[in-house]
From Swiss-Prot:
Lineage: Bacteria, Pseudomonadati, Pseudomonadota, Gammaproteobacteria, Alteromonadales
Annotated InterPro entries: Flag_Lring
Family to which the UniProt record says this protein belongs: Belongs to the FlgH family.
Lipid modification (S-diacylglycerol cysteine), residues: C16
Signal peptide extent: 1-15
Protein name per Swiss-Prot or TrEMBL: Flagellar L-ring protein
Keyword terms: Bacterial flagellum, Cell outer membrane, Lipoprotein, Membrane, Palmitate, Signal
One MF term in the entry's GO annotations: cytoskeletal motor activity
Subcellular location: Cell outer membrane; Bacterial flagellum basal body
Naturally occurring in which organism (per UniProt): Shewanella sp. (strain MR-4)
One term under GO cellular component: bacterial-type flagellum basal body, distal rod, L ring
Pfam families tied to this protein: FlgH
Assembly with partners or alone: The basal body constitutes a major portion of the flagellar organelle and consists of four rings (L,P,S, and M) mounted on a central rod.
Length: 224
């Protein structure tokens, strides 16, 4: 019987534990795009200057086609605060003085009987939650797709190896070409459908994870 109990408890704890997919550095989803450039035919004019390889001093260096690189300046700050409270009061009062039965007062030893009942209940609950996060930095991403309206789908990642672990930043979203600054940068707050992930792997990242037993006590399966 004890073995079945241990097996059932193990299955329950396994179901309560959450498993997360471990990120990999070479995820194909974030792989850069290398556009295929058509071969250029250079006419033999005998001159050192070639018009096909010339660059204008007034050309726009902002990303506008698939494979171009754009720098995303991370300026994320979120703050959330929530408070809730409720109070329930209930009371009842009953009094019978004196008690009548059969058209006369009920008494014991000549002393009339009376009934008095009073009940009250007061329940008060309060809860507060406060959370704030900020992320500053920059990451260069690739233009993965140019939409019909001219918007650019950008995506990229950056991995940094530090001591016994790796830290990474991943970003994907949609930007307007009009929002790109002349230095080919754009603020992350100007991205639509943005997905920004900053995390890490290794010893230090594992030390911040909650154990399976603690997850059980914080889950809905814990009855108390």
């Amino acid at each position: 019987m004890a073995r079945y109990f241990i097996l059932a408890a193990a299955l329950l704890l396994t179901a309560c534990s959450s498993t997360s997919k471990k990120p990999i550095a070479d995820d194909p989803f974030y792989a850069p795009v290398y556009p295929e450039a058509p071969p250029t035919k250079i006419a033999a004019t005998g001159s050192i200057y070639q018009d096909s390889q010339a660059a204008s001093l007034y050309s726009d260096i902002r990303a506008h086609k698939v494979g171009d690189i754009i720098t995303i300046v991370l300026k994320e700050a979120t703050q959330a605060k929530k408070s809730a409270g409720n109070q329930i009061k209930k009371g009842s009062d009953l009094s019978l003085d004196p008690i009548y039965a059969g058209g006369s007062n009920v008494s014991i030893g000549g002393v009339p009987l009376d009934l008095r009942y009073k009940d009250s209940m007061n329940t008060k609950r309060e809860s507060d939650a406060d959370q704030s996060n900020s992320l500053d930095g920059s990451i260069s991403a690739n233009v993965m797709q140019v939409l019909n309206n001219g918007n650019l789908v950008v995506r990229g990642e950056k991995w940094i190896s530090i001591n016994n672990g790796d830290e990474f930043i991943r970003v994907t979203g949609i930007v307007r070409s009009q929002d790109i600054k002349p230095d080919n940068t754009i603020d992350s707050t100007r991205m639509a459908n943005a997905r920004i992930q900053y995390s890490g792997t290794g010893t230090f990242a594992d030390a911040q994870k909650v154990g399976w037993l603690s997850q059980f006590f914080m889950s809905d399966w814990w009855p108390f």
